[in-house]
């Protein structure tokens, strides 16, 4: 297994698919990285040379990925909550903040239903 940015990339996959195991790299960015490094996207991870791996590492180092990206996203949400804006308020309450309805649905964000004590 190749190790890039602290993540193990599976050997049997094409390089552009394997790069998507890194947090912050999706399909489009993986293809851009491969083309910038001069590597064919259909190349398997196990067939890469050490020089190609170094080129990939150099290209990936240009982007914010993994822990730094997670920290940045967390800090952005925390900033919204500290501002007291609508989106921060919705994050604080654990509700959807992009305009979805909440009278029904939104169960993923709200969590499981809480039973209300009934009359006997």
Curated annotation (Swiss-Prot):
Keyword terms of this UniProt record: Ribonucleoprotein, Ribosomal protein, RNA-binding, rRNA-binding, tRNA-binding
UniProt xrefs under PANTHER family: 30S RIBOSOMAL PROTEIN S13/40S RIBOSOMAL PROTEIN S18, SMALL RIBOSOMAL SUBUNIT PROTEIN US13M
GO MF annotations in UniProt: rRNA binding; structural constituent of ribosome; tRNA binding
GO cellular component, one term: small ribosomal subunit
Known function: Located at the top of the head of the 30S subunit, it contacts several helices of the 16S rRNA. In the 70S ribosome it contacts the 23S rRNA (bridge B1a) and protein L5 of the 50S subunit (bridge B1b), connecting the 2 subunits; these bridges are implicated in subunit movement. Contacts the tRNAs in the A and P-sites.
InterPro entries in the record: Rbsml_uS13_C, Ribosomal_uS13, Ribosomal_uS13-like_H2TH, Ribosomal_uS13_bac-type, Ribosomal_uS13_CS
Region (Disordered): 92-120
Entries under Gene3D superfamilies matching the protein: 1.10.8.50, 30s ribosomal protein s13, domain 2 (4.10.910.10)
Homology family: Belongs to the universal ribosomal protein uS13 family.
Top-level division of the source organism's lineage: Bacteria
PROSITE patterns in alphabetical order: RIBOSOMAL_S13_1, RIBOSOMAL_S13_2
Subunit structure, interactors included: Part of the 30S ribosomal subunit. Forms a loose heterodimer with protein S19. Forms two bridges to the 50S subunit in the 70S ribosome.
Species of origin: Laribacter hongkongensis (strain HLHK9)
Protein name: Small ribosomal subunit protein uS13
GO biological process annotation, one example: translation
Pfam families found in the cross-reference section: Ribosomal_S13 (PF00416)
């Amino acid at each position: 297994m190749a190790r890039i940015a602290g993540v193990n990339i599976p050997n049997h996959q094409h390089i552009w698919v394997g790069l998507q195991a890194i947090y912050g790299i999706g399909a489009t960015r993986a293809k851009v990285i491969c083309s910038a490094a001069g590597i064919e996207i259909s190349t398997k991870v196990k067939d890469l040379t050490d020089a190609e791996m170094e080129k990939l590492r150099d290209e990936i180092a240009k982007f914010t990925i993994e822990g730094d990206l997670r920290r940045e996203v967390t800090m952005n949400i925390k900033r919204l909550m500290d501002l007291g804006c609508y989106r921060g308020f919705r994050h604080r309450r654990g509700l959807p903040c992009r305009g979805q309805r909440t009278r029904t649905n939104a169960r993923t964000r709200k969590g499981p239903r809480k039973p209300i004590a009934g009359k006997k």
